[in-house]
C-alpha cells in the first residue's frame, strides 16, 4: 500500500499512472461459476494490463483450483503465449490423489509457473 500523501501518490493522482513498472503478483484468470470477472481470457487480461500500465502478472486460473491437472495446462499455455507478460502459480491441491506427480509436473513447467500455491 502506498502512502496517499507520498510523492508517488501525488504523481499518480495528477497523471493517472506511475512512472515505474507495475507488477501484479495476485490475479485470477478464466471463468468462475460464482464470481463475475470481466477479463477472463489471457488475451483479455493482457489487453487490460496494457490499458493500465501493468508490465507483468502472476496468476492462478480458477480452473486450476478446481481441477489442477487440467487447469495447470491452461495456465502454462497462457504463459507460453505471453512469456514476457504472464507467470502462473503451480497448484498443488490439498485433495490431490498424487501429490508427487503434481510436484513433478510443476518442476517440468517451472519456466511458466515459478510460484507454488498449496
Residue ranges and their predicted role:
Residues 1-73, 104:
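An N-terminally biased module of ancient metal coordination in phosphate/nucleic-acid-related enzymes
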Residues 55-56, 66-118:
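Active-site gating/metal-coordination segments in enzymes
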Amino acid at each position: 500500500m502506498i502512502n496517499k500523501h507520498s510523492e508517488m501518490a501525488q504523481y499518480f493522482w495528477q497523471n493517472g499512472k506511475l512512472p515505474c513498472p507495475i507488477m501484479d503478483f495476485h490475479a485470477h484468470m478464466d471463468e468462475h461459476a460464482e464470481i463475475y470477472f470481466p477479463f477472463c481470457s489471457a488475451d483479455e487480461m493482457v489487453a487490460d494490463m496494457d490499458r493500465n500500465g501493468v508490465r507483468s502478472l502472476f496468476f492462478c486460473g480458477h480452473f486450476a483450483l478446481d481441477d489442477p491437472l487440467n487447469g495447470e495446462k491452461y495456465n502454462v499455455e497462457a504463459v507460453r503465449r505471453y512469456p514476457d507478460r504472464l507467470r502462473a502459480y503451480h497448484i498443488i491441491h490439498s485433495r490431490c490423489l498424487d501429490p508427487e506427480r503434481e510436484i513433478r509436473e510443476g518442476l517440468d513447467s517451472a519456466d511458466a509457473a515459478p510460484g507454488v500455491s498449496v
